Regions:
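Electropositive phosphate-/nucleotide-binding environments in soluble metabolic enzymes
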Residues: 16, 51, 55, 67, ...
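Helix-loop "lid/cap" segments that line or gate small-molecule binding pockets
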Residues: 45-49, 56-65
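Acidic catalytic patch
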Residues: 66-76
Length: 217
């Protein structure tokens, strides 16, 4: 059995939501049109009215990636993290990742953020793998514009279970730790005996009152 450290990303390892900064960066780089903001706002409104539309909201926000190669978008994602997003990393979170890596934990980031940019995260933080909201590719390695199930809430344990099966691993629950900030992270955090609540929202505190509270900057 393997000791895991399971991490959310937005507001756990980095300040704020990442998809809007990513979209704005793509607009500045000329990869996405300015009108993409209108599509994103429309998608956000649909999601607020119906939370089940989360994947549709991401699809609207990221429709500009359709037809672009994975290699091209990987390079853009590296620039995004290097020039913009890395400035939002919590210093305390980075130190914790380094400590856990040194102690032999397998570190897995499980995030509702989009795979199109999250897939390069291990190049910027000491993590082993990333599970994010999937963005479909065609046979030529180009993005289709389709977005898979939103990796949030109950979807997180499902994705983790599939990952464990794929890699022939099992979680050592007693020695593993989970890190998150919102109530939607609770299903993942409760896969371990040590839920760590990072700058937690009140609903998460009510959901997991026995969790260890952490204040990260």
């Amino acid at each position: 059995m393997t000791p895991f450290a399971l991490f959310d990303f937005d507001d756990t390892l980095a300040k704020g939501d990442s998809i809007l900064p990513y979209l704005l960066y793509c607009i500045r780089r000329g990869v996405a049109p300015k009108t993409q903001l209108l599509r994103a706002v429309a998608g956000y409104i649909r999601w607020r009215l119906n939370p089940a539309c989360a994947s549709g909201a991401k699809k609207a926000t990221l429709s500009f990636i359709k037809g672009r190669t994975q290699a091209e978008m990987d390079d853009l994602a590296r620039d995004f993290f290097r020039e913009a997003q890395s400035k939002r990393f919590f210093h305390d979170g980075f130190k914790e990742l380094c400590r856990l890596r040194g102690e032999g934990y397998r570190i897995l980031v499980v995030s509702a953020s989009a795979e199109v940019y999250m897939r390069v995260l291990p190049e910027f933080l000491p993590v082993d793998d990333v599970l994010a909201t999937p963005c479909a590719l065609d046979a030529k390695g180009c993005y289709t514009g389709e977005v898979g199930a939103n990796c949030k809430g109950d979807e997180k344990p499902l994705r983790i279970a599939a990952y464990l099966q794929e890699h022939g691993l099992s979680i050592d629950r007693a020695r593993s730790r989970g890190y998150g900030d919102s109530p939607s992270d609770a299903p993942m955090l409760l896969m371990t005996d040590a839920p760590m609540l990072v700058n937690p929202k009140k609903k998460l505190l009510r959901r997991i009152p026995h969790g260890t509270q952490l204040t990260w900057r």
